Amino acid sequence: RSSAASDVYKRQLYTFTGGVPKYIEQFMDNGCTSMESMVDFMLQPDSSFLTEGQALLVQEFGKKYGNYFSILSAVSNGKNTLPEMETVMGGMSLGGQLKRLEEDYDLIKKKRPILSKEGSQTVRYEVSDMFLRFWFRYFIKYQNYIEIQNFECLADIIKKDYPTFSGLALEMYFRQQMMESKEFASIGAWWQGKNNKDQDEIDIVGLYAEEKKALVAEVKRQSKNFKPDLFALKIEELRKKVLFKYEIESRLFSMEDM
């Protein structure tokens, strides 16, 4: 296996497992050497992966896992602001449960635009456990396929969506690397306002601990998809609105940097 191939393999393992050894071992012990074979392995009738997410939540929350389950499901499928979640759940108030999921169980994280105020309305949530994020996004959203054992169709959906989903994993991976470097006082993202459109969104912004300096990064699976001119415009907007006192270092993070 060439080093390039083994890098691809590591990325695929990380995308599905978030690096959890138990899941990685299952893939390796069963000879899963590609994204396709991992997906096919998870989608067998007797696969433990199909029920793993539920088992984890029952273990954490006992019989009361239902509401937490619904919240994680909503966030994994892009309903990531408090009003959106409360709408999905019939208008019930979720503040307390979100706080527990974040502070006691470390299953979700708040994302707010870098340097925005603590109480700002622009908070979004994300599931911080990579495996659960995957499990909810596919095994719960498409539960009907699993119930009638149409694993082929679901496998196709996951394989086609892999570029999008692995892009999210990539972003998480680089943020994790930045955290572990201990160089930053704050790491986040940036977007404008509540009804943000993608064009003003920046994937990663890190403020260095030592000086008034910021790392501003775009994450793309493949560097050929990077549009430097567009990124420069976004940085200008960010500089005007928030980072006017900072020296800005801009970076592209792609799969080659993993």
Regions found by a protein language model. Name each.
Residues 2-9:
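Short, small-residue-biased leader/transition segments that mark boundaries at the very start
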Residues 10-35, 75-78, 101:
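AAA+ P-loop ATPase catalytic core
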Residues 11, 21, 25, 36, ...:
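Non-catalytic, well-ordered alpha-helical scaffold segments
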Residues 14, 84-86:
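The alpha-helix within a helix-turn-helix
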Residues 32-84:
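Winged-helix-like regulatory helical subdomains adjacent to P-loop NTPase cores
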Residues 89-105:
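Short amphipathic alpha-helical interaction segments
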Residues 103-114:
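A short, conserved structural fragment
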Residues 121-258:
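A cross-kingdom feature that marks ATP-driven nucleic-acid transaction machinery
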